[in-house]
Amino acid sequence: TYIYPAPDDFSSKQGDDIDPIEIGNVFGDAERAPKRAAQYVSQGFTAVKFDPIMPMSAFDPRQLSLSALANAELVVKNIREAVGDQCDLLIGTHGQPNAAGAIRLAQRLEPYYPLWLEEPVPPENVEEMARVARSTKIPVATGERLASKYEFATLFAKQAASIIQPALGR
């Protein structure tokens, strides 16, 4: 499976097993995001990747507010309703929440069956990522910001993720 960075109106399909697409600049918009996702599904895409809590401006992990959690859940719920079971939801958070916030987010998103929760906490916080992974049914994904075999070895030893996404150019 390949995930490609995408501009707002990315329209070509890529990938072998699934055809992922990033929803673009409709992060956190519970009305626009589902329409965009449905548009891509109608074009034959079978997965959409998006961050329902963007934009956050903090540089270090933080607790998500109740309103941010509610909006994220509404975004994911509306996208799931728009695409049904024809499309996988790939949830990315850019490692913005702290572990407690990521766990609260995951609990709210579980009913919508996302394929993964990518970088629920900063990837260098392996212990906290493992804590999140143990606390949710959603598979945790990470790896594109890890650069050495030692970082991956720690990730594996702590069972911090079930989907590994190495950036092979690193």
Which role fits each region the language model picked out?
Residues 97-109, 147-159:
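Catalytic cores of alpha/beta
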Residues 49, 67-68, 90-94, 113-123, ...:
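Catalytic beta/alpha-barrel core
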